[in-house]
A protein has these predicted regions:
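Beta-strand-rich domain onsets/edges
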Residues: 56-107, 136-139, 184, 228-231, ...
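Bacterial N-terminal signal peptides
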Residues: 42-51
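Acidic (Asp/Glu)-rich catalytic clusters
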Residues: 116-125, 152-164, 202-206, 240-243, ...
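Substrate-binding cleft and catalytic face of glycoside hydrolase catalytic domains
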Residues: 127-141, 150-256
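Aromatic-rich peripheral "rim/lid" segments of glycoside hydrolase catalytic domains that contact
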Residues: 204, 213, 218-226, 233-235, ...
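Bacterial N-terminal signal peptides that target proteins for export
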Residues: 33-43
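Hydrophobic faces of well-ordered beta-strands that scaffold small-molecule active sites
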Residues: 96-98, 126-130, 165-168, 210, ...
Length: 450
């Protein structure tokens, strides 16, 4: 008889939303034992948000089925019969990430908030993206004077803490973000300058960034194409690959998940692929909604994008979003009821994205009011106290979607645990092994038999 179990933490989200802050002890990258409940079928629906409209129960059940099918695999442990087995999740495979502000790694590195910023990041996120440090206009404000220091500092810190980092961005052709000194260059000099930037960045950081946004928001404006012709995007990619042949290049654009520019983006991506541009993934920003978001538009957009056959990252997520009153007036704060609505909406947004197998990660565009372009969208207030959204997020990621199982192997010395894809510590009878349960493999076996 096989010991088959689905381990789900015995914690309900709505205790948190009602004011219970017990989730501060939720596990992070290294965790202790947490008593699980054992369900014969997926039971995520009872533990997460309720803001989705329509036939709620059916919608939640469908999302849960998709999550169980696409985000979980089987971890088999082989021991002597009847031995105690513990399976502890250490890290998710899926990217639950955030943007890293330049300040704590540059001019604010000695600030009293810097240590707290890094600590809270590591407690909540397993992936990162440079918010501004890699942007050309930030690195080279004056021609020929390139400042690599902040990028270097961020890369050193993320590498030390085993945080995969995406590079945002190599180019940004929206005119207001093109370095002013470039606009007086003649076309030939501009082309040589673009080539130099691509090769230099890729060569200097070869193998250190997991992926790059090649040319940010091309669909909305493309100064370099306007100046240098439609073939420049392919050339940019080729030059980056000259510096780092393994570089993974993403598109990154906005107003797609709202549905407003979805068709345009699909056409844009297909056109670049037809030109031979080596697109490695689709970056879609997640902050063009307002005080609410349309779950049906989000689901439809993700399903449509999945049809392109490329991995998807939700690269810049804020809630409330850029079309909210909180973006227009940065001093506005959420009231109690609005805080709870925000928490529920974030849970729903993440659940929809997590249920779509083509989505490989979500990265918040700021998590602390002290370094967030939409302060009201932060998980943590200026004084570092957690918002209801922080409690809800941690409960979702580190309890509802977290596998921590303890039991005994059967009379054949076998135990199968359905577990979320990620890294695990498996322990039995004083022996321990760390293994990766990957979505590519779908299953892994760990043997402690002599």
């Amino acid at each position: 008889m096989t010991c088959l179990a689905l381990a789900v933490a015995d914690d309900m989200l709505y205790g948190v939303l009602a004011g219970n802050s017990a989730d501060n002890s939720a596990p992070q990258r290294e965790i202790g034992y947490m008593t699980p409940r054992i369900f014969p079928v997926p039971a995520f629906a009872i533990a997460v948000g309720l803001s989705l409209s329509g036939t709620l129960r059916a919608e939640l059940a469908e999302l849960d089925r998709a999550i169980a099918a696409h985000r979980m695999g089987t971890l088999t442990v082989l021991t002597e019969p009847g031995q105690e087995v513990q399976v502890e999740q250490l890290q998710h495979e899926f990217w639950f990430g955030a943007a890293i502000s330049s300040g704590p790694f540059g001019w604010q590195s000695n600030s009293s908030d810097t240590a707290k910023y890094k600590e809270v990041f590591l407690e909540n996120f397993n992936a990162a993206v440079t918010e501004n440090a890699l942007k050309w206009h930030a690195m080279e404000r004056h021609q020929g004077r390139v400042d690599y220091s902040i990028v270097d500092a961020i890369l050193a810190w993320t590498a030390k803490n085993d945080i995969p980092l995406r590079g945002h961005n190599i180019f940004w052709g929206v005119p207001q973000f093109v370095p002013g000194w470039q606009k007086s260059l003649d076309d030939d000099t501009l082309r040589d300058t673009v080539k130099g930037r691509a090769i230099t960045v890729a060569r200097k950081y070869k193998g250190r960034f997991v992926e790059y946004d090649l040319n940010n928001e091309m669909m909305h404006a493309n100064y370099y194409e306007d100046r240098l012709g439609p073939g420049i995007t392919r050339q940019m990619a080729d030059w980056v690959r000259e510096g780092d042949p393994e570089a993974v290049l993403y598109l990154n654009d906005y107003d797609i998940l709202t549905g407003n520019r979805l068709d345009n983006f699909v056409t844009h991506a297909r056109g670049l692929l037809e030109q031979g541009v080596p697109i490695g993934g689709l970056g879609v920003q997640g902050h063009l909604h307002g005080d609410s978001f349309d779950p049906e538009a989000l689901e439809h957009s993700l399903e449509t994008l999945a049809g392109l056959g490329l991995p998807i990252r939700i690269t810049e997520f804020n809630f409330p979003g850029q079309r909210s009153r909180y973006y227009r007036d940065k001093k506005l704060t959420l009231r109690d009821g609005e805080e709870e609505s925000k928490a529920k909406a974030i849970v729903d947004y993440y659940r929809i994205c997590f249920a779509q197998p083509a989505v490989k990660g979500i990265l918040m565009w700021g998590f602390w009011e002290g370094a967030n372009w939409i302060p009201a969208s932060s998980l943590y207030r200026r004084d570092w106290t957690p918002t209801p959204a922080a409690h809800a997020y941690r409960r979702l990621v580190y309890r509802t979607w977290w596998t921590d199982w303890k039991g005994k192997s059967d009379d054949q010395g076998r135990c199968e645990v359905r577990a979320f894809y990620g890294r695990y510590r498996v322990t039995t009878e004083g022996q321990s092994e760390v293994v990766d349960l990957s979505s590519d493999a779908g299953a892994i076996s760990v043997s402690f038999r002599q």
